[in-house]
Amino acid sequence: MKKVFITTGTEHYLRQLMANYTGGNVTLLQNFSQSLLYQESTGEKLFQEGAEYRVLQSSGSIKGFGVVVFEYIHLRDEEIPIFLQMYQRASLHFSETPGLQSTKLTKAMNMNKFLIISFWDSEVFFHDWKKSPLSKEITNIMRKNNTQSGFSHEDIYHYPEFSHDAK
């Protein structure tokens, strides 16, 4: 089973962790307020702290540049089938979405917290997608079904990482 592991910390600390794990598939992602390490693996996580998600669906391939968007969605048990059906329907159009490199639908290992991870050529393409009819339809359906999507949030990170920390 493929998993995604995420841990956060200062850039300096995360770079030290990366230096210790030369063989691992670990990527440093950053925005202007936060840094995180992202690992995809069928094995064990390389760091002790952080979140663990099971990959439910994956499409596309990562080019090695751009932005990564993390969309966190908390759902009640009865909302999960509706959400999964909407995601499945939307995923049929991902290959046609300009600037979209890859998507991953993941679920936290011990709660009804989903994380949609999408890799984009640039932040502009992501914002264009959010304005698209399909994205708006999904948002409206979630609101109509009284989901907790209003409590969800998204974070945008750049890759490859940039360096603030000369240490």
Curated annotation (Swiss-Prot):
Domain ABM: 67-154
Site positions per UniProt: Transition state stabilizer: W129
Stated consequence of mutating M142A: 24.8% reduction of heme-degrading activity compared to wild-type
Stored SUPFAM superfamilies: Dimeric alpha+beta barrel (SSF54909)
GO terms for MF: metal ion binding; monooxygenase activity
Effect in UniProt of substituting Y87A: No effect in heme-binding activity. 37.0% reduction of heme-degrading activity compared to wild-type
Compartmental location: Cytoplasm
This protein's GO CC annotations: cytoplasm
Keyword terms, alphabetized: Cytoplasm, Heme, Iron, Metal-binding, Monooxygenase, Oxidoreductase
EC number(s) stated in the UniProt entry for this protein: 1.14.-.-
Keyword flag Metal-binding: yes
Spans annotated as Important for catalysis: 1-50
Entry keyword annotation includes Methyltransferase: no
Function, as annotated: Catalyzes the degradation of heme to biliverdin in the presence of a suitable electron donor such as ascorbate, with the subsequent release of iron. Hardly any CO is released by the heme degradation reaction. Binds heme. Allows bacterial pathogens to use the host heme as an iron source. Release of iron from heme may play a crucial role in the pathogenicity of L.monocytogenes.
Quaternary assembly: Monomer.
Stated family: Belongs to the antibiotic biosynthesis monooxygenase family.
Name listed for the protein in its UniProt record: Heme-degrading monooxygenase
